[in-house]
Every structure is written in C-alpha cells, then in structure tokens.
C-alpha cells in the first residue's frame, strides 16, 4: 500500500543494471514515481531505492517488509489484544479501479469511516484506508509474507492510516521499544488459500451487479457470532462456526489442520534459497521441495502447536464473489480504464477477509510498507489462520491488465520479495 497514486514506470522508459548488476541512483525526488515488479530491470523490487530519493528506505531500511516469520522464534506476549473494528460489521461503500501494474485497491468513499481496534497496542484513531490483494508470478506463491518458508497463493492487506486530525496516544503494550516514535499505519495481513469446492457456479454479469451493490443471495457470512444461527462462517448454513459441516479444507477430511497440514506451494526454499528460511539465497529459488518441516505444515498434526491452537479455515464465499466480480469488471480489468474519474463501486465489509473472531491469532512486528516509498512506520498484524477463496478469484486477479499492451498481473505478480531484516516478531498465542 502507498499513500501515492504512482505513475506507470514505463512512461519514463526502462533501465537495466550494468554488467556488475548495479543500477544508477537517479536524482528524482518524486514520491509517486513509477515502479515495477519485474526483477530484471532497475525499476524492479531489488532496485526500487534507485528510482527516487523518496524511495531510499527500500534499500537501506532497518525494518523492511515483508519478512519470513519463523513461528518458533516469535515471542509470545500475553496481553496482545484481540483484533476488532469499530463500528463492528460495518458495510462500507468502496471504489476500486485499475492500478496499472499494481494490486487493485478497494478504497472507502468519502464519509465512510471504520477504525481498527487493538486496545492498548495502538490508539483508536487508525482509519480504514484500503483493501488489496497481492499475487505472485506463480499460482502457488503469491503471498508477501511467509511462515517458516511457506507461502500461499495470495495475501490480503487491510490498511489503516492514523487519522491526521488526531494526536497519537501513548500505547500501554510496547513491542520491545526497538523503534522509537509512532507507526503511521496498521496493516492486517491475511494468507489466502484457494479451493474449488463449496463456492458455487461462476456468477454472471447480472448477479455481479447485485453482489457488488451488497446484495447477497443468503445470510451474510459475517453473521451473528461463532455460535449463532448464522455464525461468522454462515457460508456453511445455519450451524455457524460450530455447525455440522465445519471446514474440511483442500485435503478433504483432514482440513488445514489435518495430517498434511498446509504445505504451501513450493516447499522450503523461500524466495531464493536452497534451505528455506535458513538459506534464502540458494539454488532452487521459487521451486523448493519439502518445506522447512517436511510434510507437516505449521498447523498439521505434527506442526508447531498441533490442535491446541489449530485453525479452522473460513470459506469466504461472499468475499470470493465480490473479488471475482470486481476483478472481472472492465473498470478494473482493462488497462485503458486507468485514470477514469468513475471507478467501480463495491459494497464490502472489511471483516470479510478475516478468520472468525475466536481464530484471530496473529503475529505482529514493526515493519514497512511493501511498496515504494517503503515507509518504515507500519505495525503489521499478520493472521496465523488462513482464509480460503475460490480459485476463480486468483484467476481473475492474475488476468487484470497492468500494461498498455494488455500484459496482465500474472507476468510479474505484485509481491515484493522477502526482506532479510532481524526484526523481533511477537505472537498472540502460545
């Protein structure tokens, strides 16, 4: 997320590294300069700091994001608050447009106010700024963060920016005090899996019109609580989170916490490494073999916590249809729509991408924005439990055009590579 509407990097031509792999530092000072996810050019993520002096933190920062989270190294903090919003379950009118070669953003319309609630960790003045979803160059590795070297196909970010009209209030729960001052942003990250079962038929254009205006054919998936008639996971009928259907995940009866755990996409190698998080610079790059812990994911039977803090993955049906319909719409999908004054109006609840309230265990650390200018003023709240959307969402997002020639976001993705920072990560669960 960025506070700026960036130019397209191709508007000013493309630069390439010299024979020594070095890109010249430009004298540009614009904070809205264009940037790319093409890793072979000087506008790409490894060289963002050379594009503009405003982007210098991208190259020399001390708390850059995203990171690989090593679950057993994260420090448990007993008093970390539950993640909530005020007002609760508020449906917002948002507008989404084509963001060129970047992830489309759902931005609240004027007058729409929603705040993140993390009592004692931050004050109550962080206002909803946008929702966006990152994807990768491959279908399986699209999340920006990873846990123990494992990625998911996408990662949703709910971005909150501190209200400029209010003063920062002191926090009661400090995260080690390594970085003085206040964080301008709170960003909630959610790992998104994809699946086929239980998401119904592909919505047609007429159905999409109704869905984007907030009309859904059945009960709101954010319902009346984990055990109410409609439950937070109302997608599975009247039984809510504790209903008969539960959630069995991609692997049938085993679910995300079953024998197979969650194996991520590409195993143990992280972005570039031959040994997962411990390498990060080795031979196999995106296509490693087994994952740091072999066959059993973090939440599998042999995972870090087994069933004690297991995750029941929510099938986010309504979020799926909203994202699918939005990404398919011409105003978002077509590059030629960039700059048009009228975007696509979408009604959504920012809680839709989140796990059920009782499963909102999270990791938190002080990092940065993952796009230029890579501002180091972000409190990250990365959800441990995953959420599942339909495979059609991933397909639709990857087919959004990011270039004048019709090249889509599938070519370079919209994920920044893992950063090698030694930041301290805390967690709300044992």
Swiss-Prot record:
<feature type="repeat" description="14">
    <location>
        <begin position="264"/>
        <end position="266"/>
    </location>
</feature>
<feature type="repeat" description="15">
    <location>
        <begin position="267"/>
        <end position="269"/>
    </location>
</feature>
<feature type="repeat" description="17">
    <location>
        <begin position="273"/>
        <end position="275"/>
    </location>
</feature>
<feature type="repeat" description="25">
    <location>
        <begin position="297"/>
        <end position="299"/>
    </location>
</feature>
<keyword id="KW-0862">Zinc</keyword>
<keyword id="KW-0272">Extracellular matrix</keyword>
<keyword id="KW-0325">Glycoprotein</keyword>
<feature type="repeat" description="11">
    <location>
        <begin position="255"/>
        <end position="257"/>
    </location>
</feature>
<feature type="repeat" description="1">
    <location>
        <begin position="225"/>
        <end position="227"/>
    </location>
</feature>
<feature type="binding site">
    <location>
        <position position="134"/>
    </location>
    <ligand>
        <name>Zn(2+)</name>
    </ligand>
</feature>
<feature type="repeat" description="7">
    <location>
        <begin position="243"/>
        <end position="245"/>
    </location>
</feature>
<feature type="repeat" description="16">
    <location>
        <begin position="270"/>
        <end position="272"/>
    </location>
</feature>
<feature type="repeat" description="12">
    <location>
        <begin position="258"/>
        <end position="260"/>
    </location>
</feature>
<dbReference type="InterPro" id="IPR036398">
    <property type="entry name" value="CA_dom_sf"/>
</dbReference>
<feature type="compositionally biased region" description="Basic and acidic residues">
    <location>
        <begin position="207"/>
        <end position="219"/>
    </location>
</feature>
<protein>
    <recommendedName>
        <fullName>Nacrein-like protein P2</fullName>
        <ecNumber>4.2.1.1</ecNumber>
    </recommendedName>
</protein>
<comment type="subunit">
    <text>Homooligomer; disulfide-linked. May also be disulfide-linked to insoluble organic matrix.</text>
</comment>
<keyword id="KW-1015">Disulfide bond</keyword>
<comment type="function">
    <text>Acts as a negative regulator for calcification in the shells of mollusks. May function both as a calcium concentrator and as a carbonic anhydrase required for production of carbonate ions, which are assembled to CaCO(3) at mineralization sites. Is important for shell formation in both the calcitic prismatic layer and the aragonitic nacreous layer. Shows inhibitory activity of crystal formation when present in free state but, when attached to the insoluble matrix, may regulate the form and size of aragonite crystal.</text>
</comment>
<keyword id="KW-0677">Repeat</keyword>
<dbReference type="GO" id="GO:0005576">
    <property type="term" value="C:extracellular region"/>
</dbReference>
<dbReference type="Pfam" id="PF01391">
    <property type="entry name" value="Collagen"/>
</dbReference>
<feature type="repeat" description="23">
    <location>
        <begin position="291"/>
        <end position="293"/>
    </location>
</feature>
<feature type="binding site">
    <location>
        <position position="157"/>
    </location>
    <ligand>
        <name>Zn(2+)</name>
    </ligand>
</feature>
<feature type="compositionally biased region" description="Low complexity">
    <location>
        <begin position="220"/>
        <end position="304"/>
    </location>
</feature>
<feature type="domain" description="Alpha-carbonic anhydrase">
    <location>
        <begin position="33"/>
        <end position="429"/>
    </location>
</feature>
<feature type="repeat" description="10">
    <location>
        <begin position="252"/>
        <end position="254"/>
    </location>
</feature>
<dbReference type="InterPro" id="IPR041891">
    <property type="entry name" value="Alpha_CA_prokaryot-like"/>
</dbReference>
<keyword id="KW-0456">Lyase</keyword>
<comment type="similarity">
    <text>Belongs to the alpha-carbonic anhydrase family.</text>
</comment>
<feature type="repeat" description="2">
    <location>
        <begin position="228"/>
        <end position="230"/>
    </location>
</feature>
<feature type="region of interest" description="27 X 3 AA approximate tandem repeats of G-X-N">
    <location>
        <begin position="225"/>
        <end position="305"/>
    </location>
</feature>
<feature type="glycosylation site" description="N-linked (GlcNAc...) asparagine">
    <location>
        <position position="27"/>
    </location>
</feature>
<feature type="repeat" description="13">
    <location>
        <begin position="261"/>
        <end position="263"/>
    </location>
</feature>
<dbReference type="Pfam" id="PF00194">
    <property type="entry name" value="Carb_anhydrase"/>
</dbReference>
<keyword id="KW-0106">Calcium</keyword>
<dbReference type="InterPro" id="IPR023561">
    <property type="entry name" value="Carbonic_anhydrase_a-class"/>
</dbReference>
<feature type="repeat" description="21">
    <location>
        <begin position="285"/>
        <end position="287"/>
    </location>
</feature>
<dbReference type="InterPro" id="IPR001148">
    <property type="entry name" value="CA_dom"/>
</dbReference>
<feature type="repeat" description="27">
    <location>
        <begin position="303"/>
        <end position="305"/>
    </location>
</feature>
<dbReference type="InterPro" id="IPR008160">
    <property type="entry name" value="Collagen"/>
</dbReference>
<feature type="repeat" description="5">
    <location>
        <begin position="237"/>
        <end position="239"/>
    </location>
</feature>
